[in-house]
């Protein structure tokens, strides 16, 4: 499953109303650490296909979503379960660290 582009229009449907955990990557094209994290997020998306959704929010295109969740630094990765943010990480993280965030949120993994 490819990553989902999250916008203010689809945030409620794709994230808040999701029956599976959702990992959301807040990023920007000009952000070096975001570009480093992008292939890690893509790998996580492939590995957790069918078990979790993986979404990306471009903070330049969706400033309202970034503000709603207090995103001050990027990349910021948040995991949502049952409509609530359950885990947050700021800055570049390894694949193992990102996977651990999902595992902490759900016992499905």
Residue ranges and their predicted role:
Residues 2, 7, 27, 53-55:
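Conserved Rossmann-like nucleotide-binding pocket used by diverse enzymes
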Residues 19-21, 38-57:
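Conserved helix-turn-beta segment immediately C-terminal to the redox Cys motif
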Residues 19-20, 26-30, 73:
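Short pre-active-site segment immediately N-terminal to redox-active cysteine/selenocysteine motifs
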Residues 26-40:
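Conserved redox-active cysteine motifs that mediate thiol-disulfide chemistry
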């Amino acid at each position: 499953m490819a990553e989902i582009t999250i916008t203010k229009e689809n945030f409620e449907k794709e994230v808040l109303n999701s029956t599976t955990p959702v990992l959301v990557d807040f990023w920007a094209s000009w952000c070096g650490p975001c570009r480093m994290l992008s292939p890690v997020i893509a790998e996580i998306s492939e590995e957790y296909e069918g078990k979790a959704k993986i979404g990306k929010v471009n903070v330049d295109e969706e400033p309202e979503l970034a503000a709603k969740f207090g995103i001050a630094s990027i990349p910021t990765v948040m995991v949502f379960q049952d409509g609530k943010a359950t885990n947050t990480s700021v800055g570049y993280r390894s694949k193992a660290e990102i996977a651990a965030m999902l595992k902490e949120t759900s016992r499905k993994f």
